[in-house]
């Protein structure tokens, strides 16, 4: 049972029976929680339009099993204005949290990172920095502690101009070869600071987070990523034609 109304966002919703919904929500104090919203799809339900992703909510629930029962719901404000690539980016963030975060593990810091990422997506002209910062925050919240600033082999500080090879769960060691597993020192420093000043640094951060998140996703593709590809590829082809 929740202790009063909780700040939440809907990560995913799916219909259940004729009039109900099953919700995966991300709450500030309880982490990821699964709720049964009885009658939420009914014609007379005042919750019909409120239980949507990207809408800040206050929710209260009861129950001790893996699926709780929603008892009260109030929207805090209107949903965040997301469309196009920014909407797909936000859907990707939701799917990541739903897929990799353990249920009912309090993550108030990550909740704030999530809210900040959605706000950034609603206001920015480039979704990539917000996505990379959130992926790194998610990895940190799961205890994925990689030292980007020191060589795993020697403990020496990373040099901006040197090349380093990533070793899963261990860190980075100096390397003379360049491939998909290697990064320049300045890229590692940018990832550590979550501050990206060049396209190359953003691309390096994307490579790293994909490598680091891969074990948590279990080889199952992300639906949001595939949906984005299906939507954008036909548009790109028509532009070329």
UniProtKB/Swiss-Prot annotation:
Domain of life: Bacteria
One biological process term in Gene Ontology: DNA recombination
One Pfam short name: RecO_N
Keyword tags: DNA damage, DNA recombination, DNA repair
GO cellular component, one term: bacterial nucleoid
Keyword DNA repair: yes
UniProt-listed InterPro entries: ARFGAP/RecO, DNA_rep/recomb_RecO_N, NA-bd_OB-fold, RecO, RecO_C
Record flagged with keyword Zinc-finger: no
Function, as annotated: Involved in DNA repair and RecF pathway recombination.
Family: Belongs to the RecO family.
Protein name in the entry: DNA repair protein RecO
Gene, per the UniProt record: recO
